[in-house]
Amino acid sequence: VEIFIGKGVGSILFGQDEQQIINQLGRPDKVYELEGSKRLLYFDLQIEVAIEYEHENKFGWVEVKNPDATLFGQKLIGESIEKVLSVVSAAIAHTPEYEDCGSLEIYFYESLWLELQFELNRLRSINIGVLFIDDNTPDWP
């Protein structure tokens, strides 16, 4: 599965509604609510899709934990912080915000809505969201 910053992951695109996601990926293995969104979990794909209530119940955020997923053409899940940041820095000219949460370290590229979560020096999750035209207006692909 390929991750497309600002667009989506694989065949699903930001801006699609829940039924469109289900039509493409099938029924989710688990559904729960979190922080103003409905979360659809797909165990085999190892992704968590967020349907955001504040944005007309559209797909606006995804968490990817699949080790076969690619970002900028490379498989990065499980790789070291140094390697991942090197690959990302070569592809984009942005400096991330850094947050140390103990065993979890987060690098967030706000202008790209790209979040990299590391645990024990290894990338555990690549999270991306829809880009915004302004503070409240999503730029749907």
What residue ranges belong to the model's regions?
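Short helix/turn-capping signatures at newly exposed starts of structured segments
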Residues: 1-141
